[in-house]
């Protein structure tokens, strides 16, 4: 089911807590109508939480934690993107670099099926050179990130490419939105391992 919250200036009630059951996963669209009197803009966005699918995928691969963290962020960003576009097919986020993390891949279908994997230099991580570094640009070095939308049927394939930049997947995606879509975009992501869950 698709849900969308539309919140106007008189509807918003502030709370210092937002809680959900620990394993619930969702992508929730929202729309803030803005207020001429308060001079606030209209804002469309997504709130995403993917505990169970991210944990299941990462547990299958046994990657070092810095790679798990970047891959988890990529899954969240790709899942949000999949609900942003009219999708009847697959959206793919793929990054290639010449650092110790060489490949990052994630795709989501219009049915919500999620896949993700990474390729990396095991020796570099075995020597503990990168075990404390969670920054995308440091781990991938020079490279690019590509976004591909493949629609079912006769629709065209779309691909956008941007150079890797910043510390996170969200930083590179933000640059892509700014350059390609020319839409002011802000992505705020947070990834954390709590016990055995991501």
Regions found by a protein language model. Name each.
Residues 4-198:
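Interaction interfaces in information-processing and related assembly proteins
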């Amino acid at each position: 089911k698709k849900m969308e919250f539309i919140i106007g200036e008189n509807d918003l009630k502030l709370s210092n807590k937002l809680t959900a059951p620990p394993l619930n996963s969702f992508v929730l669209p929202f729309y803030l109508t803005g207020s001429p009197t308060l001079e606030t803009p209209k804002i469309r966005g997504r709130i995403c939480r993917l505990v169970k699918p991210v944990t299941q995928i990462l547990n299958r691969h046994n990657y070092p934690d810095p790679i798990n963290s970047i891959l988890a962020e990529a899954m969240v960003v790709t899942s949000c993107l999949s609900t942003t576009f009219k999708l009847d097919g697959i959206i793919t986020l793929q990054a290639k670099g010449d650092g110790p993390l060489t490949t990052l891949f994630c795709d989501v279908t219009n049915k919500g099926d999620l896949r993700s994997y990474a390729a990396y230099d095991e020796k570099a991580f075995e020597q503990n050179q990168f075990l404390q570094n969670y920054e995308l640009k440091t781990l991938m070095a020079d490279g690019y990130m590509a976004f591909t939308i493949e629609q079912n049927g006769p629709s065209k394939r779309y691909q956008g490419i941007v150079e890797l930049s910043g510390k996170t997947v969200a930083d590179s995606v933000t640059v892509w939105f700014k350059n390609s879509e020319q839409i002011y975009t802000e992505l705020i992501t947070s990834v954390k391992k709590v016990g055995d869950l991501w």
